């Protein structure tokens, strides 16, 4: 964590991106058959990184898996497969086909005058 602290002191914020499922053991469950691909090494890095970023009050942008990291890092739990474990009349599927990994998976609307909007303006030189 001390290395993470020194790294986080040098950055303005942290982006937690999408990716594989978190290991269910992180939120007190055994792996079920419906659980997707797991990235334990990434979990081991991102959970303490999220906790330290929050502790240091660093801005965090979480996308897809990033929201799951935030939730679990703060003590929350997850469905291993929400479509199979939570019955709903609405189809819930948050995955992207490997063959389509170059196209956006999610539409993003950035609200004007938010920190993300300011960052996007600096990064992309547009409003």
Question: What residues fall within each predicted segment?
Answer:
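Conserved G/P- and acidic residue-centered "switch" motifs that form tight phosphate/ATP-binding loops
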Residues: 64
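Hydrophobic, aromatic-enriched interface-forming segments
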Residues: 67-72
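Pocket-forming structural segment of enzyme catalytic cores
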Residues: 74-127
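Flexible gly/pro-rich beta->alpha loop and the following alpha-helix that scaffold active-site loops
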Residues: 1-61, 74-75, 79, 83-88
